[in-house]
Amino acid sequence: MRRLNVWVLLSAAILFLGTVITAQPAAFPEAFRVIGNIYWVGGEYGSYLITTPQGHILLDTGSTEMHDVIVSNVKKLGFKVEDIKIMISSHAHWDHVQGHAAMKKLTGAQVVALGGDAAALEAGQDNSAGGFPGMIAVHVDRVIKDGDIVSLGGTTLRALWTPGHTQGATVWMTTVQEGGKNYSVAFRGGEVPNDGVPLINNPRHPTVIEDTRMTLQRLKALKPPDLFLHNHHQNLGRPLDAALPVDSHCDTCMDAKAFTDMLARSEKNFTEQVRDAEAKK
């Protein structure tokens, strides 16, 4: 009888723990205004709505499952999803562009992408060094190159090509106004390949090492933006520059110092990865 009681208690404990685990999904920030005309509308992965009087720009659509989250968040903020006129992306990995096809079907928005990432979107296949899961193929209405401009309703974003994480990874740069002041804002593209990706003689991205080194040098040469918006939750655990008028719960927000520190870490880690890969040749 005692043994039976033990098993009953153990089974109950397992059921309780299972209930707790499944009942507590990861909590992500509600939709909110970041700064100026930039809003967070993402969920598990980053997605930003840049609003203008003539329609809106959506940066990244996340995974397929995140589509409904974005649609709901846009509505919660008081905007119409149908007013999204342009879709851009940080880079063509599934967790950032898998929702492009559904969003284009819903809104009719123009899809804009750079070089190799445009090819990935058109094919519905990841062509980065990692060869990750793909996405539903979507027509790219405008294929851009480094330095090109995307403009809508008085808002201008400039594309900075940063290959390495993907072939067409793009940092988008703009300026916003908040409280009568101008702030430079950059949206992360992707600096380095994912950990564990083959770097030597990679069949998908043969120049991944050279491209990544170029990207790191380009980003280091930039004047650090006032605000750098990451495309993943970072839980940075450090306060933002007090001069930045940004909500403290924005865990994708990085100030100029955090941006510089991130680049230093990325360069150090990538240098070590290349050294290890070359040692195994």
What does each model-found stretch correspond to?
Residues 1-6:
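Positively charged n-region of N-terminal signal peptides that target proteins for export
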Residues 24-29, 33-35, 83, 115-167, ...:
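Metallo-beta-lactamase
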Residues 28-77, 172-193, 198:
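Conserved beta-strand hairpin/beta-sheet module of binuclear metal-dependent hydrolase folds
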Residues 66, 92-98, 118-121, 167-170, ...:
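Active-site environment of divalent metal-dependent phosphoester hydrolases
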